Amino acid sequence: IHSMQAFSAKFKHNYRIGAIPNANEAYSHMNEQIIRLPAGETYNTFFEKKLMELPYYETHKIRKNATLGLEFMLSYGTSGLPKDFSVKEWMEKSKQFLMDQFGKENIASAVLHMDEGTPHIHAVIIPIKDGKLSARAFLPDRQAMRDLHTKYYQYTKEVGLEPENRYMHIQHQ
């Protein structure tokens, strides 16, 4: 996420503000906030408050090419699920993974979408490390992203999930 406009667009999609063409409203009641934004906040206000807490930004500006946020989509697919699969258990494992990898304080929100073709979680992270924005501290290279996939599998294998399309990049429509 490289702009405040992108934060706004993510917020509108994740919290179902306005028309969402690929969402089925009949299932929207099943969506759930796993990690909640503070009451009355948006991704923009959450980001601004986080930066105001950092002494570094009292004397420094945000770089023009800075990554302001990261968004991850965590999914369990729809085929080949174990008979005893529990969405609640998967959500808890996913939440723990996010908190362990990025720190609870850096997570703006995690929202479960059950109203699209494949159930998934959108997690928005403000990548703060050592008192300043640093996406590179969390994802220095492609291998780090691959390692993240492997770590996520370690968390979710207990609920019976196996990775399907390992390292596949999916463009969200």
Residues covered by each model-derived region:
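N-terminal nicking endonuclease/strand-transfer module with a His-rich metal-binding environment
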Residues: I1-Q173
